[in-house]
Amino acid sequence: MMEFKDFSTGLYVAAKFSELTLDALEELQRSLRVPNPVPREKIHSTICYSRVNVPYVPSSGSFEVASSGHLEVWKTQDGSTLVLVLDSEYLRCRHMYARALGATHDFDDYTPHITLSYNVGPLSFSGDVQIPVVLDREYKEPLKLDWADDLK
């Protein structure tokens, strides 16, 4: 049972992907000549970034969560971030599960995606991508508000 103090730590939940998916994503980064690519071991998809902790139970099992997506560049505080936006009902449902448990979300909408680079500078990328995105596992940990420091 969770105690009151447990709710104040925040919660981060993410999906990690199969070796085959990681191979395909690295090949995509290389073929596009993506500057500052996210390293293989850091590639993930955020499911929940909540300022309150909730009793989220990570899913187990390995299965395809998306078969396609498209590239977008998002303007962020730190520059231009290249993401592969996924058409994933599974990731949307897992996010809604966290919200149903009381998790917070800082944005109007949840957009399932995989970040390919946190800084592509002035470059632009677009287009549809066919990649089998296979879940390896979900994991959860206390929320780190200074997560960007880990990228340096």
Curated annotation (Swiss-Prot):
Residues where 3',3'-cGAMP binds: 12, 141, 147
Positions contributing to 3',3'-cUAMP binding: 12, 141, 147
Keyword Hydrolase assigned: yes
InterPro entries: Acb1-like_C, Cyclic_Pdiesterase
MF GO annotations: hydrolase activity
Keyword Hydrolase listed: yes
Source organism, top-level taxon: Viruses
Record-annotated active site: 44, 46, 113, 115
Keywords (A to Z) from UniProt: Hydrolase
Effect of residue 141 to A: Partial loss of cleavage of 3'3'-cGAMP
N-terminal signal peptide: none
Pfam families: Acb1 (PF23474)
Reactions accelerated catalytically: 3',3'-cUAMP + H2O = U[3'-5']pAp[3'] + H(+); 3',3',3'-c-tri-AMP + H2O = A[3'-5']pA[3'-5']pAp[3'] + H(+); 3',3',3'-cAAG + H2O = G[3'-5']pA[3'-5']pAp[3'] + H(+); 3',3',3'-cAAG + H2O = A[3'-5']pG[3'-5']pAp[3'] + H(+)
Stated family: Belongs to the anti-CBASS protein Acb1 family.
Stated role: Counteracts the host CBASS antiviral system. Phosphodiesterase that enables metal-independent hydrolysis of the host cyclic di- and trinucleotide CBASS signals such as 3'3'-cGAMP, 3'3'cUA, and 3'3'3'-cAAA. Does not cleave cGG or cA4. Besides evasion of the CBASS system, might also enable evasion of the type III CRISPR systems that use cA3 signals.
Protein name: Anti-CBASS protein Acb1
Organism in which the protein naturally occurs: Enterobacteria phage T4
Gene: 57B
